[in-house]
Amino acid sequence: MKFMLAVLGDPLHSQGPITAYRFAEAAVTAGHTIHRVFFYQGAVLVANDLAEPPQDEISITELWQHLASENSIELMACIASASRRGIFDEDEAVRYEKPTSSISSGFIIGGLGQLMEGILVADRTVTFGS
């Protein structure tokens, strides 16, 4: 089965991103595929390359990066939500005249069109967070 995941919760105040990660990990272990993970609203903070968790905490960003690279999963941050929170890829950094990009490696910027495309391509869409 092919899944599309929509993650909405801020990783600092919501279980959405870690619950979505655990679901994705279990799904690929069971032989399913994850077409795309779309981070929306506060969940785009998972893609922030400038954030650094304390050394005694798990980095949700690194967990997603590893899972995505091992399983060819596309990690996409909503462009509107990301720019509101200071997260830019190279193109958006130039567009908004920012000194550098701030998106973590393995993540890309996309819009609601890509969310809809992912929903149409997947067999099931699962939403995490509120």
Q: What are these model-derived regions, one by one?
A:
Residues 3, 34-37, 75:
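Hydrophobic/aromatic residues located in beta-strands of well-ordered beta-sheets
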Residues 3-18, 46-52:
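Short, glycine-rich nucleotide/cofactor-binding loops
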Residues 6-8, 38-39, 79, 127-129:
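Short beta-strand segments
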Residues 17-30, 37:
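Histidine-anchored nucleotide/phosphate-binding helix
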Residues 24-25, 61-63, 110-114:
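A generic local structural motif
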Residues 38-48, 81:
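Short, conserved active-site loops that position catalytic residues or coordinate cofactors/metal ions
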Residues 53-82:
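A glycine-rich helix N-cap at a beta->alpha junction
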Residues 79-130:
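N-terminal glycine-rich phosphate/adenylate-binding segment common to multiple enzyme folds
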